Every structure is written in structure tokens, then in C-alpha cells.
């Protein structure tokens, strides 16, 4: 998760390099999307750690088998971090890269894309782990409030990815 924060900070810095009014809206969109995905992912990680006593990424192995909601939610968070369309994480990066290109910072946009591709490899490794079968981990239970919180966050990531202009216009 720390590397995710560093990569996201790079996109925010690209936007600040452009320093245009419109770009600030995209920074807010990016930070909002990233924050929602990070809060959900950390909430899931914390729940898994608490209920399984596994403190590493291997604790995610088989998550899809032991709690479908947590597994699907973590996969959506990882795909959003990776910037895979149609999730909000894609548009959060896309809008900033378009602004960079528009203001002749194409080389920085290319670096941003390359970093995103490299980071996607790590997210895809986590996703593969989530989908593997592991019968040693107990079933993970959630309270109704925790379930609602995770579902609301995932709905935000999907809807604001399918209709980013709605969120962007609200931020203006």
C-alpha cells in the first residue's frame, strides 16, 4: 500500500507541474478516488489480519473463497489502483495525463504511463493471490455496517468510473 501512495503522489505532482485551474479539479478527483480505494483496501486488510492473524499479503490468498464481498472489493480496489478502465482509478490518471500532454509535458505523461504499467504487475499479483484457493484460512465475517461501508465505497469507484463527468462537475 505504501508504494501505491507513492505512485499516486507522482500523478498529483504531474498535475501540479501543469498548474492550470482545470487541473486542480482533476487532482481533487484523483485524491478522492485514491482515498476511497485506499480506505476500503486498508479496511479489508485490517479485517483479514484481525480475523486470521496473518499480517502479510499472503493473508489475502483465497480471500475470494472465504468472503466473496471482501474478495471482489479488494480486486476492484487493486484494479482501480492499477488504472484499469472503467474504474475511477483509470480516469483519475487519464485526466491528469491528458492535461500534461495538452501543456507539452508529454515525456512526463509517458513516464506516468510506464510507472502505471509496472505498478499494475504488483496489483495483478495480489489479485491472483486473492483468487487462489486456500483452505487453511477461516471464513471471514463482517458486520452489517462494515458490509455497507465496503459496498458504498465500491459503488463509488465503479459509478465514478462509469460516469466521471458527474463527479468532476460536482467538484467544480
What are these regions (language model features)?
Residues 1-172:
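Alpha-helical transmembrane segments of multi-pass membrane proteins predominantly involved
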Amino acid at each position: 500500500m505504501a508504494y501505491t501512495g507513492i505512485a499516486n503522489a507522482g500523478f498529483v505532482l504531474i498535475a501540479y507541474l501543469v498548474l492550470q485551474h482545470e487541473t486542480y479539479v482533476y487532482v481533487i478527483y484523483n485524491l478522492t478516488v485514491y482515498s476511497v480505494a485506499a480506505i476500503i483496501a486498508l479496511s479489508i486488510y485490517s479485517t483479514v489480519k484481525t480475523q486470521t492473524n496473518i499480517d502479510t499479503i499472503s493473508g489475502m490468498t483465497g480471500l475470494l473463497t472465504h468472503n466473496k464481498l471482501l474478495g471482489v472489493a479488494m480486486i476492484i480496489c487493486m484494479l482501480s489502483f492499477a488504472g484499469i478502465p472503467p474504474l475511477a482509478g483509470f480516469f483519475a490518471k487519464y485526466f491528469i495525463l491528458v492535461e500534461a500532454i495538452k501543456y507539452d509535458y508529454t515525456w512526463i505523461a509517458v513516464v506516468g504511463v510506464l510507472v502505471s504499467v509496472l505498478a499494475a504487475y504488483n496489483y495483478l499479483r495480489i489479485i491472483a493471490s486473492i483468487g487462489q484457493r486456500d483452505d487453511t484460512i477461516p471464513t471471514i465475517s463482517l458486520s452489517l455496517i462494515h458490509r455497507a461501508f465496503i459496498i458504498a465505497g465500491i459503488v463509488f469507484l465503479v459509478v465514478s468510473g462509469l460516469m466521471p463527468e458527474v463527479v468532476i462537475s460536482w467538484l467544480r
